[in-house]
Amino acid sequence: MQSRLAWSKGNWTGLVGSLISLTSSSTSHALVGNNSILICGKIKIILNIEMVDTGRIFVITGPSGVGKSSLVRCLIDHFKDKLRYSISATTRKMRNSETEGVDYFFKDKAEFEKLIAADAFVEWAMYNDNYYGTLKSQAEQIIHNGGNLVLEIEYQGALQVKQKYPNDVVLIFIKPPSMEELLVRLKKRNDEDAITIQNRLKQAEKECQQIGHFKYVVTNNEFDKTLAELQAILLAEFN
């Protein structure tokens, strides 16, 4: 995946320029369609270059309960022709409202660790005693076909993706208005016990300390306003 993202037309032109500098001063260069032509004295070199139009990776993260999933679903619906979602894998228990292969690929710990050993993930992380990861098979297919990819992942995974693909990733952090409001939202889900909710709040405080790594930080106070702000961010990045 990295080579496809890195080798754009500009990169190839730079490579050709480097080749020219190593040849005689009589060398000339022309770029015709996908063919780069070097003329070194009487020698003509034609490089047939396949230009791959790859998309961008939008990584959306934030504490559990902040509203990431709902926002991402609305973004995908709004940008039907421009944005694709990569379904993550996890070892956490499936919620009543979730569907296998739609919300997540649900794995047991042994299955997930086999995938880690097989280098099957773009990124993976342990969060609240469960594994989460983005499958390469999902992500690479979308990006290689020129699609823009949106990932809804934990902040550790977000930083891994940025490190691997620094020029192609846009990091967006969704922040709660306050920890008190986040607690209210977590309780409203009514699918976790009090200890789990408290653990999520502690984790949320740690995550909010990482916002300096993100290009955009959006506070989800009112859903419609937050969605409009995210739509504006993506439109600007598409262009």
UniProtKB/Swiss-Prot annotation:
State its role.
Essential for recycling GMP and indirectly, cGMP.
Q: What is its EC number?
A: 2.7.4.8
Q: Which reaction does it catalyse?
A: GMP + ATP = GDP + ADP
Location within or outside the cell? Cytoplasm
User: Which residues are ATP-binding?
Assistant: G62, P63, S64, G65, V66, G67, K68, S69
Q: Which GO terms describe its cellular component?
A: cytosol
Which controlled-vocabulary keywords does the entry list?
ATP-binding, Cytoplasm, Kinase, Nucleotide-binding, Transferase
Which SMART domains does the protein's record reference?
GuKc
Give the residue spans that cross the bilayer: none
> What is the uppermost EC class here?
transferase
The Gene Ontology terms for molecular function here are: ATP binding; guanylate kinase activity
Organism source for this protein? Mycoplasma pneumoniae (strain ATCC 29342 / M129 / Subtype 1)
Q: Which residues form a coiled coil?
A: none
Name of the molecule in the record: Guanylate kinase
Residue ranges of every copy of the Guanylate kinase-like domain listed in the record: 55-235
Name the gene.
gmk
Record family assignment: Belongs to the guanylate kinase family.
